[in-house]
């Protein structure tokens, strides 16, 4: 029978529940168990696809085209699995589906209520995550903190799961903060005690506590927490601040986190072989070089807005024994007058995805600088589109060239709306989303980046595409269309082969990068940038 692990949080948000859940998932997977993981977000949006990155951070896209919370990126990178639409569920999605059933008459005239209809829908999503993947273990993280009014239906559903499945088949983990008061030189357990008290008031007794802390907790403190919160002392897991998040699975393994869970489930499994992870973590802590990458984007003020890009750069750097010094530059600040000052010390320039016209000219200026000065360049999604526009303006001489998204009246719409998007009215969930095949042209930089594979599957999130009526003119000036859809209609990758590295993709390669298996384009980009990387002092 499938076993279910529920991860909740208390005291403060952004406490690291997702990393804890992903770390446990990796340990259980390495013990030979099939694991899947999901995130419930209490907000009323159906998905994060229409939310500002400043509000929510990055939108992560799964193979099946679901726009999800950025925590799913952590899940995939840590556990090395591909997730699906059941891996991210919001209050908005639950209510939308319940209301659709009510309109169809599925409830046979019953009064539709939070209990049982909403809670049953939540439980169905939990069960589906396991049945659709045939998993041994389902890990479910609840966003926000216990006590938030928005999360109450989810907490109630988790409580009911124990009655539905039996206590031997569910395991509750509660993550909390132990604040350190520098003035007093003390760590305080009271917030954790109150958070657990709140959780217990909703009918859930946690089996394990994960306490986030700046300082190591003492045995006395561990026993105190265990006594007041009614858990075993060994089930109080310390989560210290670390230099790299890839230390966390090893840290919690040392505290027998995975074994405690399996003992509760009465599941026998060999000890997790984490030798590859140990090597990775040691390598990450001892990198000998530094590569400076300039990321020119729209949402640089928020760290999480480009989290998958940041992690993909790091993964590629690890294989080159290089730490990535990421210099985030607001595209709005880049002008022809200051571009040398802003980008002159960069070993590579990356322009990521985005939407809208704000900062567009700054991105084009940065791309022009990379092309004219032969600085390794990687463009992603909008970055690829603007690389095409820059080439049209400054190489083909089409001075008013633009994207129809930015300037609908441009005489040279190098980037145009996709035909199947013309009658689309809703914004949410209507883009070209998910994994699609990209056919690579043999002998190109892109093909070599993927070890000369003929076709690669990559994830997309866009409405606009390269306008094929400009393909011939650009090719005549040296641009190579090295990746296309299998029918050759949609341009997926462009490159300038005479440059050290100048490649841009319509798809989002960052979503498939793994810490021990960097994505091809990122690896090739960092390899090129590494030629000017600096040895660490």
UniProtKB/Swiss-Prot annotation:
CTP binds at residues 13, 148-150, 188-193, 224. Disulfide bonds: none annotated. The keyword Ligase applies. The keyword Magnesium applies. ATP binds at residues 14-19, 71. One of its GO terms (cellular component) is cytosol. Pathway: Pyrimidine metabolism; CTP biosynthesis via de novo pathway; CTP from UDP: step 2/2. L-glutamine binds at residues 54, 354, 382-385, 405, 463. Allosterically activated by GTP, when glutamine is the substrate; GTP has no effect on the reaction when ammonia is the substrate. The allosteric effector GTP functions by stabilizing the protein conformation that binds the tetrahedral intermediate(s) formed during glutamine hydrolysis. Inhibited by the product CTP, via allosteric rather than competitive inhibition. UTP binds at residues 13, 188-193, 224. Its EC number is 6.3.4.2. Keywords: ATP-binding, Glutamine amidotransferase, Ligase, Magnesium, Metal-binding, Nucleotide-binding, Pyrimidine biosynthesis. Residues 292-535 form the Glutamine amidotransferase type-1 domain. Gene3D superfamilies: 3.40.50.880, P-loop containing nucleotide triphosphate hydrolases (3.40.50.300). Mg(2+) binds at residues 71, 141. It catalyses: UTP + L-glutamine + ATP + H2O = CTP + L-glutamate + ADP + phosphate + 2 H(+); L-glutamine + H2O = L-glutamate + NH4(+); UTP + NH4(+) + ATP = CTP + ADP + phosphate + 2 H(+). Residues 1-267 are annotated as: Amidoligase domain. One of its GO terms (molecular function) is identical protein binding. Belongs to the CTP synthase family. CTPSs have evolved a hybrid strategy for distinguishing between UTP and CTP. The overlapping regions of the product feedback inhibitory and substrate sites recognize a common feature in both compounds, the triphosphate moiety. To differentiate isosteric substrate and product pyrimidine rings, an additional pocket far from the expected kinase/ligase catalytic site, specifically recognizes the cytosine and ribose portions of the product inhibitor. NCBIfam families: PRK05380.1, PyrG. Catalyzes the ATP-dependent amination of UTP to CTP with either L-glutamine or ammonia as the source of nitrogen. Regulates intracellular CTP levels through interactions with the four ribonucleotide triphosphates. This is CTP synthase. It comes from Lactiplantibacillus plantarum (strain ATCC BAA-793 / NCIMB 8826 / WCFS1) (Lactobacillus plantarum).
